[in-house]
Amino acid sequence: TGVQTCALPIFTGYENGTITGDAELIKNYIGEGYFFRALCYFRMLAYYGDLPIVTKVLEDNDEVIVENSKRTPRNEVARFILEDLDKAISYLASRGKFNGQRVNREAALLFKSRVALFEATFEKYHKGSGRVPGDNNWPGANMPYNSGKNFSIDSEVDFFLTEAMNAAKQVADNAQLTTNNHVIEPQPGVITGWNNYFEMYSQPSLANVPEVLLWKQYSFSLSISHDAAYRVKTGCADGYTRTFAESFLMKNGLPIYASNDYQGDVSIDNVKAGRDERLQLFVWSESTLLDSDPSAPQYSQPFKKPGIDNSNQEIRCITGYQPRKYYTYDYTQTPNDELRCTKI
């Protein structure tokens, strides 16, 4: 159904010249159609591998449907997805046109890189399993509609890796990254502007953050809200695992088991000390400032401890490693479950 929905405007309207209106907007909409068709096929590729490629609206006829239900080898499906994304890239406007709030050229390039990397690594690491076209035990080799096809798995892997690198490079070379200024928490009374990297995940607008390619804006006045920032403050029966926390390196680049600077895990403060600053920024610990906004009831108080033993699931952290990512120190955004900050 998703494929048909994407195909209809592309094949029945644009190519026939029957769609009228602003030419630039129409091009962008068609680009979105190719993007979402590629997304539909990518999801099916991940689930099924080999699958039919349908490039037109089919008649409601059993013979026609059966004829078009022949499974195409997965590498050809992946190439088809990349072709759709190339078309999307050629039609879509850049991120700046709609401030990153619509599918854009850069987002399509990044998605192309993801698709290509997925297929390259799948074929590389599943070679010989019977799931890759070219394997001796690949079931598709016995299908008459694949007769005469030859597959070089190594060549396909090289092709997809190259496509992934080229697409990603076009995005990375033109995206200004948000700088982490190494400030781990604000001073009391400082609400915003203390660390742009931390605030990137919860500020009201990301229009001027070029590295965020696609984002959704929330508005309390329009009754469009979410509760992520409030929930990470209260616990919400969530939490990072100990294994995840231990996977972060020390700031000197060493793993915790190889560093004399690791202070152990008697407290979360100890766990975070001297570690990768992403762990320091995005996990609450005993001394972390809870509220810096003077209007907040718990202004200038420390977090103290996660509610790991609390029977109320809404304010319980089930692991003790309570996320601080997506939190905002603007109390007007977090008095209750209705938030207006952005979502990436």
Predicted regions span which residues?
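Enrichment for repetitive, rod-forming helical segments
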Residues: 44, 112, 119-121, 331
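Short acidic (Asp/Glu) and glycine-rich catalytic loops that position anionic groups and cofactors
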Residues: 62-65, 143-145
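Conserved, well-structured interaction surfaces
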Residues: 1, 7-48, 64-105, 268, ...
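Primarily recognizes Gram-negative and organellar outer-membrane beta-barrels
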Residues: 61, 76, 127-128
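Short, conserved phosphate-binding/catalytic loop or strand-edge motifs used
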Residues: 56-62
